[in-house]
Swiss-Prot record:
Organism per entry: Neurospora crassa (strain ATCC 24698 / 74-OR23-1A / CBS 708.71 / DSM 1257 / FGSC 987)
Any GO molecular function: metal ion binding
Subcellular localization, as worded in the UniProt entry: Cytoplasm
InterPro entries named among the record's database cross-references: DPH1/DPH2, DPH1/DPH2_1, DPH1/DPH2_2, DPH1/DPH2_3
Protein name per Swiss-Prot or TrEMBL: 2-(3-amino-3-carboxypropyl)histidine synthase subunit 1
Domain of life: Eukaryota
Length: 459
């Protein structure tokens, strides 16, 4: 996990003692500046100078820094204290490992860590939340946890989970759970923000990297520069194949949009690759997305319309060239913004599916509408459908603070303009249109509208 990612409370915490200050010199004289060297070099130098001083130099004689005892040997560090290290009694439990073998071997559900976490917290009711693609494993995971953590009760959360923004700690808390295990997404909502103790399990998926490498070498000539991205499940693979591809003659860049991990993208958040140039100062030749489906890939394609994109599907083991209708999408979004500027009444939707909705972003738009004297009405919806919004025919423009891709992908299906927060601020003349550049996809970036802080609401 990268340094700038929201910190997870299940990592390795190091508790390092501070080094003791050196003892004061016995002779009051101006001391040379201390030099810090590697332990081996410093020890050798100190030993040599001690031997030399004892045989050839009188006390108080002028000496060089190396001979004056100014070399300070670094104190050996105490080994880090592993606060959450899974004990061997769990790792080597034969019965537990036999039960884990029922799950796919290339899927890392981190059962050992989960059991250790449950026991450490003395949790009694554990909520399990995962996307629909993993629900077929939910009952097996539940059975394993209840068998090896006697006395606990598990609750499988069956509501739709589209992404990391859908983590539902509110419902888990309301159901009396004291631990939420969220599978297959990264820590978009930090664990110090969630309302109950939370464990993120990325579900790292191992794939046949030899086929991936052979496919790339067959289709792309050495010397090409590649920006490699993917979902969190394949993040380890992306970093693992980088050195091999570089040895084969490719220049590999793993871009980052903080606070996501390097190489990780979301359907609403991806890096602008103009900030990640090659060693020769040029733009990368291509985007390579590792994963199934197009939803996340389209994010980085929208953000970087001039760079060709390819997708390697690790399940079908196929490499495909992907395209996107940038002009059509941008025309549709600009049309919606133009219509919104003449709307006499607005409707503001706060998404209530997990943590999708940001009340601070909603408040920011409210303040702008109040300043303009534009009437509006607030709604709270877990999912947004055209038929439901059509029932409020007096509302001439909608803004949904939930998922930007809902407006981008499906906005044309709604009877009235359905804007993202970014588009709403353009319509209210608080932000500039993207012009001839790329439509921004930075919703959960560090300064994105998905992370609006209360201070940003001040007018």
């Amino acid at each position: 996990m990268e340094d700038d990612r929201a910190q997870v409370d299940l990592g390795i915490a190091a508790d390092i003692d501070e080094m003791n200050p050196p003892p004061p010199p016995s002779v009051q004289q101006k001391q040379p500046k201390k030099r810090f060297l590697g332990r081996q070099s410093a020890a050798a130098g100190k030993s040599s100078s001690s031997s030399s001083n004892s045989t050839s130099q009188p006390a108080g004689a002028n000496t060089s820094i190396e001979d004056s005892g100014a070399i300070q040997v670094a104190q050996p560090r105490r080994a880090p204290r592993m606060l959450n290290q899974v004990p061997d009694s769990i790792l080597h439990d034969a019965a537990l490992n036999e039960a884990i073998a029922l799950l796919p071997s290339n899927y890392s559900f981190e059962i050992h860590k989960t059991i250790h976490r449950i026991r450490t917290l003395d949790a009694k009711r554990v909520a399990l939340q995962m996307p629909e693609g993993l629900l077929l494993f939910a009952t097996t995971i539940s059975d394993i946890l209840t068998q090896f953590c006697p006395g606990i009760e598990t609750l499988i959360m069956g509501d739709v989970t589209y992404g990391a923004c859908c983590i539902d700690d509110y419902t888990a808390r309301a159901m009396g759970c004291d631990l939420l295990v969220h599978y297959a997404h990264s820590c978009l909502i930090p664990v110090d923000v969630t309302k109950i103790k939370t464990l993120y399990v990325f579900v790292d998926i191992s794939i046949d990297t030899s086929h991936l490498l052979a496919t790339l070498e067959r289709n792309f000539a050495p010397g090409k520069s590649i920006a490699m991205v993917g979902t969190i499940q394949f993040n380890a693979t992306i970093h693992g194949v980088r050195s091999t591809l570089q040895k084969a003659g490719y220049e590999v860049i793993i871009p980052q949009i903080a606070p996501l991990s390097k190489g990780e993208i979301l359907g609403c958040t991806s890096p602008n690759l103009s900030q990640f140039l090659t060693s020769s100062g040029k733009q990368v030749d291509m985007i390579l997305y590792l994963g199934d489906g197009r939803f996340h890939l389209e994010s980085i394609m929208i953000h970087n319309p001039s760079i060709p994109a390819y997708r390697y599907d690790p399940y079908s083991r196929k490499l495909t060239h992907e395209t996107y209708g940038h002009e059509e999408m941008q025309d549709v979004r600009r049309s919606a913004i133009r219509q919104a500027k003449t709307a006499k009444k607005w409707g503001l939707i706060l998404g209530s599916l997990g943590r999708q909705g940001n009340p601070n972003t909603l408040g920011l738009i409210e303040e702008k509408l109040k300043a303009n004297g534009t009437p509006f009405v607030n709604f709270c919806l877990s999912e947004i459908f055209p038929g439901k919004l059509a029932m409020m025919s007096d509302v001439e423009c909608w803004v949904q603070v939930a998922c930007p891709r809902l407006s981008i992908d499906w906005g044309y299906a709604f009877p009235r303009p359905l804007l993202t927060p970014y588009e709403a601020l353009i319509a209210l003349e608080e932000k500039e249109d993207w012009g001839k550049g790329a439509y921004p996809m930075d919703y959960y970036g560090r300064e994105g509208l998905g992370r609006t802080k209360p201070a940003a609401m001040e007018v």
